[in-house]
């Protein structure tokens, strides 16, 4: 069945060209007193991108008319077209995602990026060299995250004429980013960053299955096929719950086709939901017994524990995220197991990879790029379209309440550490946990019975809708 969260979103999402990505973007937000801007001139040169400009997506023209303008007039016309296109795209993005906020919203608060803390300080006593080192490390880390965007020019989907996912594929692309990041963590570790020289084979092997064709294991084509029973279809937007289930189905299919030692996705996929198939209200429950079962199924009974990715689809309110959940959302990025959040504005999904205070830093899939074929046999392939240098942020309170958390646990010790952190987070949530943790289904049933006459439980669940 479809999640309740999916009813909040329209059927299409929006697109933009790459020109927005290639604008200069200061690390510090433009808002704030002017003396702060002059004081921290170092920050203005970080997170800038190349100066190339690309046009917004459109079908190629079949016209064969020759150019008749002079070089000067041709350049003038080109500048006018770029200016008009950039302005239209900027206004369009502001309507969908809100004002284009770039850089760092604060010069003093720590930044958390998928479990790693960057201590940003603007104190008089802090040296500029130290600040510059931190900013450079943050820039390198962010720009090393995998970006998946709209693509054009791939083979049509089955029984359709779609050769691009423009205007509807953003949630699928966001989910591809999350899984690609989990694979990078698995193969190369959290400390890995993109090198300027030829890429590592493990890096290329990570990108290869996300190609835009059916032979690619995690392509948009195969996700749509795997998620058909959850409403995935070419041309239609999809919500967080449905895409999580699509990944679960795709992982199960690939597991059955391949032996455990040669899995394209070398980890179990486990979705955290409510007890008794969601019949009880309240926060979703991570049952350790069920997670262990997922690992056993993935290894086909050969191992009691394997790497695992946990997906937690949530609905944190009605029209917007209830503010009482925001501190917990922020805290999840301090977990070393965090692989981010699938979320954004209604009908416009993004991949949130970090936070500063109550702002979320995200990678935006709403850019249209040509299909690129990446594999380990072509180490010199240009993979720049899979990365972004522009740090964008969105207030967490403005997110659509339908979202999904992601966590990757490398082994049993890592999973145990995650459970301890999750339990502590639930205890400190003031009665509004994102999700809870229990050992067995017996404990869940006892909890259900114990809460039967508890008025505070009803109050705690007012904003919850189970998936």
Curated annotation (Swiss-Prot):
Pfam families: Peptidase_C54 (PF03416). Residues 452-467 have a biased composition (Acidic residues). It catalyses: [protein]-C-terminal L-amino acid-glycyl-phosphatidylethanolamide + H2O = [protein]-C-terminal L-amino acid-glycine + a 1,2-diacyl-sn-glycero-3-phosphoethanolamine. It is found in: Cytoplasm. One of its GO terms (molecular function) is endopeptidase activity. Keywords: Autophagy, Cytoplasm, Hydrolase, Protease, Protein transport, Thiol protease, Transport, Ubl conjugation pathway. GO terms for cellular component: cytoplasm. Constitutively expressed. GO terms for biological process: autophagy; protein transport; proteolysis. Its EC number is 3.4.22.-. The active site is at 170 (nucleophile), 364, 366. Residues 1-35, 448-467 are annotated as: Disordered. It is an enzyme of class 3 (hydrolase). Belongs to the peptidase C54 family. Cysteine protease that plays a key role in autophagy by mediating both proteolytic activation and delipidation of ATG8 family proteins. The protease activity is required for proteolytic activation of ATG8 family proteins: cleaves the C-terminal amino acid of ATG8 proteins to reveal a C-terminal glycine. Exposure of the glycine at the C-terminus is essential for ATG8 proteins conjugation to phosphatidylethanolamine (PE) and insertion to membranes, which is necessary for autophagy. In addition to the protease activity, also mediates delipidation of PE-conjugated ATG8 proteins. PANTHER family: CYSTEINE PROTEASE, CYSTEINE PROTEASE ATG4. Interacts with ATG8. This is Cysteine protease ATG4a. It comes from Arabidopsis thaliana. The lineage of its organism: Eukaryota, Viridiplantae, Streptophyta, Embryophyta, Tracheophyta. The gene is ATG4A.
